[in-house]
Amino acid sequence: MRKIAIYGKGGIGKSTTTQNTVAGLAEMGRKVMVVGCDPKADSTRLLLGGLSQKTVLDTLRTEGEDVELDDIRKVGFSKSICVESGGPEPGVGCAGRGIITSINLLEQLGAYASTQALDYVFYDVLGDVVCGGFAMPIREGKAREIYIVVSGEMMAMYAANNICKGIVKFAEAGGVRLGGLICNSRKVDNEKEMIEAFARQLGTQMIHFVPRDNMVQRAEINRKTVIEFDPAHSQADEYRSLARKIEDNDMHVIPKPMHTDHLEKLLIEHGLAA
């Protein structure tokens, strides 16, 4: 079983990318569980056809300790298994603690047991690794492979660089490695070349360039992944390609985060000022 966490700047398209990739893997016959690690609980919505799923924390609040595995997971597109950690009420408590509670409960209930015959577990993690709770999947070795969703925008690259610093911090203790960058295009000038150069500097690869296409939004409005909504569309093939590349990937590295000055220089060389 491969344990993969998807990180990236808030709003970069992590949840959309994760769900479409999971749809691609599930379509290939892989058994995949997705664990949403975001208080918004929107990491599985497209796989579930828009159904709002009761989160682990909400279930614990209402059911107490008397919780069974099927209370906190639902079956989505192509038999994918969907779990949402959830979070505290806004302004109260720590969302990072919610992730820790949720993953520990899943372990106790046997969600990762060999009898479940999982090929993949994906953690869709909120934002940056500034908070210990959100770093939990890599800190505790729950995830062994990290993919960072990035674009050619400056703040997305800053966030990716910071996430790499977090990976380095936990790499030796937790055994976590970076599998690559996924460029979720924003149609920035020289974007593909810039992210390829950024990946080289980090000592990793741009595993896939996902072009920007309105079909993604169209599918989301219809509460589906692109692969389910329009399986013959070229954008569906992009996500299938990403799924296959992750399946075949054997490049797992401890990244070499860039100094801020060097990152800004790369942006100037390849970016809008080029």
UniProtKB/Swiss-Prot annotation:
Subunit structure: Homodimer.
Cofactor detail note: Binds 1 [4Fe-4S] cluster per dimer.
Post-translational modification: The reversible ADP-ribosylation of Arg-97 inactivates the nitrogenase reductase and regulates nitrogenase activity.
PANTHER family in the cross-refs: LIGHT-INDEPENDENT PROTOCHLOROPHYLLIDE REDUCTASE IRON-SULFUR ATP-BINDING PROTEIN
Molecular function terms from GO: 4 iron, 4 sulfur cluster binding; ATP binding; metal ion binding; nitrogenase activity
Residue pairs linked by disulfide bridges in the UniProt entry: none
Cited InterPro entries: NifH/chlL_CS, NifH/frxC, Nitrogenase_Fe_NifH, P-loop_NTPase
Residues involved in ATP binding: 8-15
Domain of life: Bacteria
Catalytic activity: N2 + 8 reduced [2Fe-2S]-[ferredoxin] + 16 ATP + 16 H2O = H2 + 8 oxidized [2Fe-2S]-[ferredoxin] + 2 NH4(+) + 16 ADP + 16 phosphate + 6 H(+)
Keyword list, A-Z: 4Fe-4S, ADP-ribosylation, ATP-binding, Iron, Iron-sulfur, Metal-binding, Nitrogen fixation, Nucleotide-binding, Oxidoreductase
Record-listed E.C. numbers: 1.18.6.1
GO-annotated biological processes: nitrogen fixation
HAMAP family from the UniProt entry: NifH (MF_00533)
Name of this protein: Nitrogenase iron protein
In-chain residues carrying the UniProt-annotated modification ADP-ribosylarginine: 97
Family per record: Belongs to the NifH/BchL/ChlL family.
Record's function text: The key enzymatic reactions in nitrogen fixation are catalyzed by the nitrogenase complex, which has 2 components: the iron protein and the molybdenum-iron protein.
Cofactors named for this entry: [4Fe-4S] cluster
Chain's gene name: nifH
Binding site for [4Fe-4S] cluster: 94, 131
